[in-house]
UniProtKB/Swiss-Prot annotation:
The gene is Il13. It is found in: Secreted. It comes from Rattus norvegicus (Rat). Cytokine that plays important roles in allergic inflammation and immune response to parasite infection. Synergizes with IL2 in regulating interferon-gamma synthesis. Stimulates B-cell proliferation, and activation of eosinophils, basophils, and mast cells. Plays an important role in controlling IL33 activity by modulating the production of transmembrane and soluble forms of interleukin-1 receptor-like 1/IL1RL1. This is Interleukin-13. One of its GO terms (biological process) is regulation of proton transport.
Length: 131
């Protein structure tokens, strides 16, 4: 009986040594990106009146400039409470200084509501397919 208990304990100890190493964490999309998607979804769903009094912003190429370009475009909108949280989230997602953002000069203006929808689609693609 003692030999049997010793064998079981030995196997248990050796089994612990043979277990695989630490399990890699799956790389989940950043929390800030999820927050941005939620915020943009809320903004686009709650449009009973015109967003930001139909203010216009520069249309930017989000695939080239990313969140920094979006933030730069929305910076000139100051009197619109609906997008303040979006601006704060974009500020956290933009990891470059404003002077480092190299983008072609914009030539087209679009309504803020259209820009927000465009930014929402871009963010969803990043969330699905990664950076």
């Amino acid at each position: 009986m003692a030999l049997w208990v010793t064998a079981v304990l030995a196997l248990a100890c050796l089994g612990g040594l043979a277990t695989p190493g630490p399990v890699r964490r799956s790389t989940s999309p950043p929390v800030a990106l999820r927050e941005l998607i939620e915020e943009l979804s809320n903004i686009t769903q709650d449009q009973k009146t015109s967003l930001c009094n139909s203010s216009m912003v520069w249309s930017v190429d989000l695939t080239a400039g990313g969140f920094c370009a979006a933030l730069e475009s929305l910076t000139n909108i100051s009197s619109c409470n609906a997008i303040h949280r979006t601006q704060r989230i974009l500020n956290g997602l933009c990891n470059q200084k404003a002077s480092d953002v190299a983008s072609s000069p914009p030539d087209t203006k679009i309504e803020v509501a259209q820009f927000i929808s465009k930014l929402l689609n871009y963010s969803k693609q990043l969330f699905r397919y990664g950076h």
